């Protein structure tokens, strides 16, 4: 995909071996699912891909992080990092899932497996209905807004241009 992977600690040997194993095996059947489940924390990967798509995080290619303990039987896990290009109004109707399937080698391998696709759909639906339910998110945003509102003035004094990005609601409340 033209993206260089940076190793912060350890090496890519185990990761590349996992990709090679999945690429070399027919992973779309039941045995493929057993192989997938033995190598990765499936829920961790689904959460990572789902949030990337849900947030329309256009910088996903160079903002992926994963890790695995160096012990027998450990599985690959994923982290959510750097969503600075996520939840951007200009990308609100953008579908990144096609891009992820096309350019994210591991995801493109996994979607060949029916069990993975079903788990992905079920976990994504659960996130939409629970984790990202509108009232739940509104309550979280409101509670965080109350915590940080006293810092808005200091932030604007230091980074005055960011005030241009504020909503009219914030301006109406005297924050800009």
Question: Positions of the model-derived regions?
Answer:
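Middle-to-C-terminal accessory/interaction subdomains
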Residues: 1, 6-168
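Single conserved hydrophobic/aromatic residue that forms the stacking wall/gate
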Residues: 166-176
């Amino acid at each position: 995909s033209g993206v260089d992977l940076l190793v912060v600690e350890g090496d890519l040997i185990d990761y590349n071996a996992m990709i090679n194993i999945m690429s070399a095996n027919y992973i779309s059947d039941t045995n493929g699912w057993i192989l997938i489940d033995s190598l990765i924390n499936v829920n961790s990967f689904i959460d990572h891909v789902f949030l990337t798509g849900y947030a329309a995080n256009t910088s996903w290619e160079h903002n992926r992080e994963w890790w695995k303990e160096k012990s027998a039987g450990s599985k690959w896990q994923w982290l959510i990092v750097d969503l600075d290009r996520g939840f951007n109004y200009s990308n609100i109707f953008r579908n990144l899932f096609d891009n992820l399937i096309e350019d994210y080698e591991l995801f493109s391998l996994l979607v060949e497996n029916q069990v993975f696709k079903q788990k992905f759909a079920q976990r994504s639906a659960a996130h939409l209905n629970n984790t990202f339910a509108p009232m739940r998110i509104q309550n979280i945003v409101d509670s965080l807004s109350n915590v940080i509102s006293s810092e808005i003035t200091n932030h604007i004094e230091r980074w005055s241009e960011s005030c241009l990005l504020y909503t009219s609601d914030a301006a109406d409340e005297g924050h800009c």
